[in-house]
């Protein structure tokens, strides 16, 4: 599921795999392998993609069906 979400987010944002790979400072083929599920995506990349797409890491990982980012909580 996570791999499909990576592709869906990219396509929904009218981006090419090359665009996302450049944002993550990695080779295109490495990113392609993440989308195909051939290679496990590192935590740092999931965090960066969540920020980039304004969504949650849980959504990217398939742990949530809501693409909305988590609400920030105020500390006293």
Please provide the spans of the model-predicted regions.
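Alpha-helical residues within the helix-turn-helix
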Residues: 11, 22, 51
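Residues that mark the N-terminal boundary/hinge immediately upstream of a DNA-recognition element
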Residues: 5, 16, 42-45, 56
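Short, charged recognition helix plus adjacent turn
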Residues: 61-76
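DNA major-groove recognition helix of helix-turn-helix/homeodomain DNA-binding modules
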Residues: 25, 44-59
């Amino acid at each position: 599921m996570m791999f499909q979400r990576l592709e869906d987010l990219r396509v929904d944002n009218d981006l090419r795999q090359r665009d996302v790979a450049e944002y993550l400072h990695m080779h295109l083929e490495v990113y392609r392998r993440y989308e195909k599920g051939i290679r496990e995506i590192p935590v740092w990349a999931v965090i960066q993609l969540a920020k980039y797409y304004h969504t949650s890491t849980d959504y990217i990982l398939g742990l949530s069906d809501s693409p909305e980012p988590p609400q920030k909580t105020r500390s006293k």
